[in-house]
Amino acid sequence: MAKATKKAEAKTVTIEQIGSPIRRPDVQQRTLIGLGLNKMHRRRTLEDTPSVRGMIRAVQHLVRVVDEK
């Protein structure tokens, strides 16, 4: 008998940039670029991993979590 396999859906988090990286430390600017954000009010849907959560926490004053699935 064949086993029914279900692909585990990866959890995702959608973030939006709400703050400007101008006059911010270089490490914060690079973190935003690492998250795929570089212009105001852009949104990205990323896989919800500990590394992504850490990056969001590092720039939490510049981004907003829109949706978590």
UniProtKB/Swiss-Prot annotation:
> CDD domains recorded for this chain?
Ribosomal_L30 (cd01658)
This entry carries the following GO cellular component terms, namely: cytosolic large ribosomal subunit
| UniProt keyword Zinc, yes or no | no
| One term of GO molecular function | structural constituent of ribosome
Q: Which InterPro entries match?
A: Ribo_uL30_ferredoxin-like_sf (IPR036919), Ribosomal_uL30_bac-type (IPR005996), Ribosomal_uL30_ferredoxin-like (IPR016082)
Task: Give the record's GO biological process terms.
Answer: translation
A Pfam family recorded for this sequence:
Ribosomal_L30
Q: Recite the UniProt keywords alphabetically.
A: Ribonucleoprotein, Ribosomal protein
Assembly behavior: Part of the 50S ribosomal subunit.
**What family does the entry list?**
Belongs to the universal ribosomal protein uL30 family.
List, alphabetically, the PANTHER family matched: LARGE RIBOSOMAL SUBUNIT PROTEIN UL30M, MITOCHONDRIAL RIBOSOMAL PROTEIN L30
Protein name, UniProt field: Large ribosomal subunit protein uL30
